[in-house]
């Protein structure tokens, strides 16, 4: 007996997608927190922010999760995490093995569970969206949201005006280029210069990225490798304890600043 599917009308597929997606865009036109970048620090921050009851939107320019996790170390499918971040791995249900002084996790499981736990906590993640600018106010000076564009439009070079999303806080978790802070520093008198990261010194990088995670200006925060770009810190390679701890720390700082 042939398998029978529900009748499918092609136009109804379009309606279902456009109507439900549009409803969510309207809902998230205003959020408590916008996290830019779905890498390790961004996903960690999103999970803990959402758990605190903050309306949290994650925007990722690519069509995947995990930032630099997926490539492991030079395409070997493993990443290293320091024992100091063990509690976060356990909190996300990420399995690991012990290897000398480190914990070693599977890169695919690592990024999948970071994303799943962030979503389960209530964060909304939308792929294929780039942040090309910020919304600001000057009394007092601060960031109040972002200007967004489809990544495909950005890549194509077409001239298409962006749309705007307001938020009480924006977290730059875009990685090595600190893209949100970079554009804000160029266009707003933030007295911040993004000089970029230094060459590798893993121990110092991991420690100082966590120490310097936090607020750049009212409404704008740095997490993960964006911190290295802003503060000219060393890079660290495929070791992710600092990224996890930075994501958790920025969530705590944002929640405190928003009085939650």
UniProtKB/Swiss-Prot annotation:
One of its GO terms (biological process) is thiazole biosynthetic process. Keywords: Iron, Metal-binding, NAD, Thiamine biosynthesis, Transferase. Transmembrane segments: none annotated. PANTHER family: THIAMINE THIAZOLE SYNTHASE (PTHR43422:SF3). Glycine binds at residue 235. Its EC number is 2.4.2.59. Pathway: Cofactor biosynthesis; thiamine diphosphate biosynthesis. Involved in the biosynthesis of the thiazole moiety of thiamine. Catalyzes the conversion of NAD and glycine to adenosine diphosphate 5-(2-hydroxyethyl)-4-methylthiazole-2-carboxylate (ADT), an adenylated thiazole intermediate, using free sulfide as a source of sulfur. HAMAP family: Thi4. It catalyses: hydrogen sulfide + glycine + NAD(+) = ADP-5-ethyl-4-methylthiazole-2-carboxylate + nicotinamide + 3 H2O + H(+). It holds the Pfam family Thi4. NAD(+) binds at residues 41, 60-61, 68, 131, 159-161, 225. Fe cation binds at residues 161, 176. Its cofactor is Fe(2+). One of its GO terms (molecular function) is iron ion binding. This is Thiamine thiazole synthase. Belongs to the THI4 family. Homooctamer; tetramer of dimers. Gene3D superfamilies: FAD/NAD(P)-binding domain.
């Amino acid at each position: 007996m042939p398998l029978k599917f529900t009748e499918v009308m092609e136009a109804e597929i379009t309606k279902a997608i456009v109507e439900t997606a549009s409803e969510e865009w309207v809902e998230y036109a205003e959020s408590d927190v916008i996290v830019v970048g779905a890498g390790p620090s961004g996903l960690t921050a999103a999970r803990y922010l959402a758990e605190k009851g903050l309306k949290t939107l994650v925007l990722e320019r690519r069509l995947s999760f995990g930032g630099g996790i997926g490539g492991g170390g030079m395409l070997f499918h493993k990443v290293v995490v320091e024992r100091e971040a063990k509690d976060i791995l356990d909190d996300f249900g990420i399995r690991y093995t012990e290897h000398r002084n480190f914990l070693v996790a599977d890169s695919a499981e690592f990024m999948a569970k970071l994303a799943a736990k962030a979503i389960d906590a209530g964060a909304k993640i939308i792929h294929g969206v780039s942040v090309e600018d910020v919304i600001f106010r000057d009394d007092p000076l601060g960031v109040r949201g972002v200007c967004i564009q489809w990544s495909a439009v950005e890549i194509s070079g077409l001239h298409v005006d962006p749309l705007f999303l307001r938020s009480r806080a924006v977290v730059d978790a875009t990685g090595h280029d600190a893209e949100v802070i970079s554009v804000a520093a160029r266009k707003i008198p933030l007295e911040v210069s993004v000089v970029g990261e230094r060459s590798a010194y893993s121990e110092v990088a991991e420690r100082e990225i966590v120490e310097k995670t936090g607020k750049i200006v009212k409404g704008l925060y740095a997490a993960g490798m964006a911190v290295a770009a802003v503060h000219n810190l060393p890079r660290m390679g495929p070791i992710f304890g600092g990224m996890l701890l930075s994501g958790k720390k920025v969530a705590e700082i944002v929640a405190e600043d928003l009085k939650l």
